[in-house]
Amino acid sequence: MDENRSKALAAALSQIEKQFGKGSIMRLGASDVGKDVQVISTGSLGLDIALGVGGLPRGRIVEIYGPESSGKTTLTLQVIAEMQRMGGTAAFIDAEHALDSQYAQKLGVNVQDLLISQPDNGEQALEIADMLVRSGSIDVVVVDSVAALTPRAEIEGEMGEPQMGLHARLMSQALRKLTGNIKRSNTMVIFINQIRMKIGVMFGSPETTTGGNALKFYASVRLDIRRTGSIKKGEEVIGSETRVKVVKNKVAPPFRQAEFDILYGEGISREGEIIELGVQHKLIDKSGAWYAYKGDKIGQGKDNVREYLKEHRDIAMEIESKIRAAVGVSNPAEPAPVE
């Protein structure tokens, strides 16, 4: 670039920074753009690895969708619990009016510090989300769910009255407004979404998510969560086998999958994942029903090993660190010290 053009560019950059603030424009190579993505653990080791960066990215929009009772709310509550352990603050916008505080507490959520809002309509819910994001003091905002964000006009109208495209228009407008504020405040906003069936689809999947197409475009990460089976202890069902597919990922390669167990009343079984991934990466030796670590037997059967790792947290953490090192995914930030 010749000298005159360089001077003109420098003057323009200076004017932009003066008018819009420092950092409003920067050179990609000389900045931290795209480097060292700050993440929050999902509470699932396998999913952290599948996401490629060790968790869900901060300053981004995340969509988690799936059929009913597939573990969508459980996964988001685990993210909130992980954020709180790191000393962060979270807010839960409960548009479905269905959050169970006792269940959240069992998953490790500090319900005393969790901010909760149960809005009357979709506009109110998204306005509250925007105000929380703009405050810059919230780390995670969860909206549960997109399907329950009923536009005010629909609530005030007659039952059965056609309201074409109101929901999609509401989401599109809100996301245009939210996206810049989310990046500036480094807040992660998680939208939980439901599945609907498209009518008359001959080829391909008839499934679609609610709220139009805007969220699909604005989301940096989209997770498809499904229940694949039941976990039994004798005849009693104690949990569900779950598979999550990373359908979209702007911070790492997409289309990876993770499988884990969700135990009723406990949430994601971290110890179960450590066992499976430990065996996979040859850190834990499996011979018949027996499991051994560093030559020492740690239990017979997966349930007994899971209990052993719960009692010996230091060994569980050691194996987890080795798994993360083996796959090249760093540990999330250590929890903030308690005052």
UniProtKB/Swiss-Prot annotation:
The record's comment on protein family reads:
Belongs to the RecA family.
Tell me the compartments it is located in. Cytoplasm
Report whether Iron shows up as a keyword of the record: no
User: What function does the entry list?
Assistant: Can catalyze the hydrolysis of ATP in the presence of single-stranded DNA, the ATP-dependent uptake of single-stranded DNA by duplex DNA, and the ATP-dependent hybridization of homologous single-stranded DNAs. It interacts with LexA causing its activation and leading to its autocatalytic cleavage.
Q: Where does ATP bind?
A: 66-73
Entry coiled-coil feature ranges:
none
Task: Tell me the superkingdom of the source.
Answer: Bacteria
Protein name as catalogued: Protein RecA
Residues crossing the lipid bilayer are: none
Q: Name one GO biological process term.
A: DNA repair
Arranged from A to Z, the UniProt key words for this protein are: ATP-binding, Cytoplasm, DNA damage, DNA recombination, DNA repair, DNA-binding, Nucleotide-binding, SOS response
Annotated organism of origin: Nitrosospira multiformis (strain ATCC 25196 / NCIMB 11849 / C 71)
Which GO terms label this protein's molecular function in UniProt? ATP binding; ATP hydrolysis activity; ATP-dependent DNA damage sensor activity; damaged DNA binding; single-stranded DNA binding
What does the record give as the organism's lineage?
Bacteria, Pseudomonadati, Pseudomonadota, Betaproteobacteria, Nitrosomonadales
| Signal sequence residues | none
**GO cellular component, as recorded:** cytosol
